[in-house]
């Protein structure tokens, strides 16, 4: 089974999801998205899978509000995420069974 996690090692939820995946016997591909940001196409695919760019937008601890992204259209949000990956909520899990924003962490269990 091929699983990828968009991961931030400083995030407790992201670490918990990574541990859940590993506990299932799978070693996922780990993308530290703050170091290696996803391209615009990957962002668009994930946003579509999780319910739109607004669902993927991280608000707490980011300049999303100051940037006018609350209530903005998908194209505007995705363009901002492409330039500023701290705006991407995490962890995102991509698996053969689907793609989810794993908040809370237990949501990842449905993909394992």
Language-model segments: which ranges?
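Local sequence-structure signature of Cys/Sec-based thiol-disulfide redox active-site neighborhoods
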Residues: 1-24, 28-36
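Thiol/selenol-based redox catalytic cores and closely related redox-interacting motifs
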Residues: 33-112
